[in-house]
């Protein structure tokens, strides 16, 4: 099962989160679930086409009632922003025309592109387009990923490799890539190289390590804390958690989309219960 299915969808809700974050149960035209799905697909196609040279890793879309938030994770943020933000403004205006809503565009830089599967696949495809031998391109990508800290990498090329008349597939692997293990952090990327002989498909799997039980519990707790409680506020404390008792968990303060800072709950914040005479 793990060998065939998409690694991202296989681990969705376990080690991976959704890349389209919204909910719709409306029957109104333009606000239905299928309308939003088609709109998300159109947004991603436009972004990948206009920012093909920017090295876009992933696009995350969030929706509210009258606003669409688009987060772009790229290895070359300067190309996306442009001179004095002209390119970013052009992309935002194009998305507003497509969606008919106000668009908030956020650009994030990928710190280590050598272990980002989508960027590695794009890099191999660019080399194949420039007529670099496929074995050299695969070997260089493997060496760069392992040197950058990956625990394993697997690359598959399919098509008319080297201009051969009959298409074939070739695998290259280094290290461990446990596709069946759910707690394994597997990054997956796919890209097509357009060569003079036709298209060559590039698939990349990168193994970055296992998610520990503590990290999994922290992720689940964070997802639970992000859900709004009653009247838009936080949920009431449990019956056993009275005033004066220190909670067992930790408050997580978000400092960015890819970073988290944990703050311990101080004992001085506890309030002693009042006694009636």
Swiss-Prot record:
Which GO-annotated molecular functions does the record name? mRNA binding; rRNA binding; structural constituent of ribosome
Please state which protein family the record places this protein in.
Belongs to the universal ribosomal protein uS3 family.
Subunit and interaction comment:
Part of the 30S ribosomal subunit. Forms a tight complex with proteins S10 and S14.
Query: Cross-referenced HAMAP family, in alphabetical order?
Result: Ribosomal_uS3_B
InterPro entries from the entry?
A: KH_dom, KH_dom-like_a/b, KH_dom_type_2, KH_sf_prok-type, Ribosomal_S3_C_sf, Ribosomal_uS3_bac-typ, Ribosomal_uS3_C, Ribosomal_uS3_CS
Q: Where is the KH type-2 domain?
A: 43-111
Q: Which GO terms describe its cellular component?
A: cytosolic small ribosomal subunit
* GO BP, sorted A to Z: translation
Tell whether Ribosomal protein is among the UniProt keywords.
yes
Biological function:
Binds the lower part of the 30S subunit head. Binds mRNA in the 70S ribosome, positioning it for translation.
| Matches recorded under CDD domains | KH-II_30S_S3
Kindly indicate whether the keyword Ribosomal protein belongs to this entry: yes
**Keywords on record:** Ribonucleoprotein, Ribosomal protein, RNA-binding, rRNA-binding
User: What is the name of the protein in this document?
Assistant: Small ribosomal subunit protein uS3
Task: List the biased-composition ranges (Basic and acidic residues).
Answer: 264-277
SUPFAM superfamilies for the chain: Prokaryotic type KH domain (KH-domain type II) (SSF54814), Ribosomal protein S3 C-terminal domain (SSF54821)
Query: Where in this protein does the record put region Disordered?
Result: 216-277
Source taxon at top rank: Bacteria
